[in-house]
Amino acid sequence: LGDVYKRQTLNMEAMVSVRAAYGTIVEELKDVSRSYKEADMALEVGRVFYVEKKILAYNELGIGRLIHQLPASLCEMFLNEVFEDGKADIFEEEELTTVYTFFDNNLNISETARRLYVHRNTLVYRLEKIKKLTGLDLREFDDAITFKVALMVKKYLTSRGIDL
């Protein structure tokens, strides 16, 4: 609670939004430069994938850090394999909300339906619609990961000014 209060106070008083990042802890002076570069990367990755986070740790960036280091050409090739013609924009807002909520609830259909205030069958219908569009069954872990990474890759490319 104290951290939240301090952040809100800082944002209100200074009228700016502050973000901070840190790299790995180092023991020797010669490693400070590396830790600084990690913190800088954490800020870059955070701008793309973790917009809501105000404090970013390099070692907690997860898959976002990996995607950030991939060449754009490889990302484009991946999107072309996952989505027809690489077009990840074929999904409506409702479908994307469904997918993100489904992922947030660890692929649990019942809990996702409850959170979205829809009937379980409505959720299954939406997931089937996505399966028809992509060939990916998001109820299957491997397909869900592929789709999640594809959405992150699309977000990364968009942040770099590359629209597919």
Feature-to-residue mapping (PLM):
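Cytosolic nucleotide-utilizing catalytic cores of signal-transduction proteins
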Residues: 3-164
